[in-house]
Amino acid sequence: MELLSRVLLWKLVLLQSSAVLSSGSPGTAAASSSVVSESAVSWAAGTQAVLRCQSPRMVWTQDRLHDRQRVVHWDLSGGPGSQGRRLVDMYSAGEQRVYQPRDRDRLLLSPSAFHDGNFSLLIRAVERGDEGVYTCNLHHHYCHLYESLAVRLEVTDDPLLSRAYWDGEKEVLVVALGAPALMTCVNREHLWTDRHLEEAQQVVHWDRQLPGVPHDRADRLLDLYASGERRAYGPPFLRDRVSVNTNAFARGDFSLRIDDLEPADEGIYSCHLHHHYCGLHERRVFHLRVTEPVFEPPARASPGNGSGHNSVPSPDPTMARGHSIINVIVPEDHTHFFQQLGYVLATLLLFILLLITVVLATRHRHSGGCKTSDRKAGKSKG
């Protein structure tokens, strides 16, 4: 009889659809990607162009813990402001854990919850201490998604008062003491019910379209899969010059590199990021323009090497930069030094002789003047 009642309860849950969690990510039907960025870039011909396309949500982290990336847990709080406690949790691999010994065999979760989307909690016999707000929490660690649903449980002594109603925010269950209670939590989104091969649903591709060509007729350049598979398309003159890092899915960096850029490479490049499992569809657009190559002036020949007929001689570092500076170079030849010294001594000697001549002439004139004055004085006395 007890087993039959449990089966009837679970069948009732499958028919209920009033309390269904809705996932925050779009479904797989939304395969069209949305443009998240559009920019115009220019690179000189002959250089390497890098079109940046990065997304941390596309980082591939393989599940090495046997599908422990999805988990459901139920919490209980007495009301606003009260500290909640964990009741039970279960991973998508089937591992279930009840935290309190008194709740073992009293709290039940369906083992097929991650297959049919039924995460409802069954309390076999309600007690007074079971009153409070129950929260159903779904966590998808791989896709970084979190969903929650609250249900309030009230316990009554009169079985005739048992009922269920909506208070405007959450479902409220009024259950008789000792009777079973079913906290409904249903989410049938594929994220919670299926375990797809994520690496097969993660793909990045680069497209190229010439000016005037619509987006839906763009040429495919590259296809990248999280499994490691890569496919190259496009014209031969461009196929061998484009590349993406081999560890792109490990770093979330899918930037496109174009070597030896040519004018024919101009166009519109699009980076498409698709994570079908998590519902991610993004597109980044780049308008690439190729400019004239930058020519560097030829290197000048070093002074004195005599190389090159058209080479311009380097300026003499000893030349004066301005008119107020005079550079004097004294050779190291001793003969030339003594010759210059002789010129200086001869000039000095001539200057001394000239000075002596001037002194003698001055004295002679002074003595002649004195004699003339004496003669005039003698005549005046006589």
Curated annotation (Swiss-Prot):
* Top-rank lineage group of the source organism: Eukaryota
Disulphide bonds annotated for this chain are: C53-C136, C185-C271
* Short sequence motif RGD 2: positions: 251-253
Question: Where in the cell?
Answer: Cell membrane; Cell junction, Tight junction; Cytoplasm; Cell projection, Cilium membrane
Q: Keywords in UniProt for this one?
A: Cell adhesion, Cell junction, Cell membrane, Cell projection, Cytoplasm, Disulfide bond, Glycoprotein, Immunoglobulin domain, Membrane, Nucleus, Phosphoprotein, Repeat, Signal, Tight junction, Transmembrane, Transmembrane helix
Topology versus the membrane, per the UniProt entry?
A: Single-pass type I membrane protein
Q: Where is this motif: RGD 1?
A: 128-130
Q: Where is this site: Cleavage?
A: S324, I325
Does the keyword section mention Chloroplast? no
* Residues of the Ig-like V-type domain: 26-156, 159-291
GO cellular component terms given for this protein: bicellular tight junction; cell surface; ciliary membrane; cytoplasm; nucleus
Gene3D superfamilies in alphabetical order: Immunoglobulins
Task: Tell me the segments the record calls region Disordered.
Answer: 297-317
Answer whether the UniProt record assigns the keyword Transport to this protein: no
In this protein, the residues bearing a glycan are N118, N305
Q: Which residues lie on this side of the membrane: Cytoplasmic?
A: 362-382
Its domain comment says: RGD motif 2 (but not RGD motif 1) is involved in integrin ITGAV:ITGB3 binding.
Classification via PANTHER family: MATRIX REMODELING-ASSOCIATED PROTEIN 8 (PTHR44793:SF1)
What's the subunit arrangement here? Homodimer in cis. Does not appear to form trans-homodimers. Interacts with ITGB3; the interaction inhibits ITGAV:ITGB3 heterodimer formation.
Q: What is this protein called?
A: Matrix remodeling-associated protein 8
Source organism of this protein record = Rattus norvegicus (Rat)
From which lineage does this chain's organism come? Eukaryota, Metazoa, Chordata, Craniata, Vertebrata
